[in-house]
Amino acid sequence: MSRSLKKGPYIEYKLLKKIEELNKQEAKKTLKTWSRSSTIIPQMIGHTIAVYNGKQFFPVFISDQMVGHKLGEFVPTRNFRSHVKSDRKTKR
């Protein structure tokens, strides 16, 4: 179920204030955030936000096509480790 339109998109308050401050200064700095559930808004376009995946921060450059999505969608949280096919040499 999606969020109600009358409520507006969810954005962490501290992250929003940092973005607004950088827009006033016209500075391009990397912001660290743990808020994977924050929605990307048009004011974030052009900024780099380092999103925490549970182990480390991944830098995400925000483009206009990302507006409306969540920050956590662009950061992988799990590593895929496939099973190695057993060779005939190892069976000997």
From Swiss-Prot:
Give UniProt keywords alphabetically. Chloroplast, Plastid, Ribonucleoprotein, Ribosomal protein, RNA-binding, rRNA-binding
Q: Which SUPFAM superfamilies match?
A: Ribosomal protein S19
Q: Which residues cross the membrane?
A: none
Q: Where in the cell is it found?
A: Plastid, Chloroplast
Q: Which coarse location class describes where this protein primarily resides?
A: plastid
Spell out the coiled coil positions from the record. Answer: none
Q: Which GO terms describe its molecular function?
A: rRNA binding; structural constituent of ribosome
Output the GO biological process annotations, alphabetical, semicolon-separated.
ribosomal small subunit assembly; translation
* Domain of life the protein comes from: Eukaryota
Q: Does the keyword Ribosomal protein apply?
A: yes
rRNA-binding in keyword set: yes
A GO term from the CC aspect:
chloroplast
Query: Which PANTHER family does the record cross-reference, listed alphabetically?
Result: RIBOSOMAL PROTEIN S19P FAMILY MEMBER, SMALL RIBOSOMAL SUBUNIT PROTEIN US19M
Q: What does this protein do?
A: Protein S19 forms a complex with S13 that binds strongly to the 16S ribosomal RNA.
The UniProt entry's sequence similarity note says:
Belongs to the universal ribosomal protein uS19 family.
Full protein name: Small ribosomal subunit protein uS19c
Task: Supply the source organism for this entry.
Answer: Gracilaria tenuistipitata var. liui
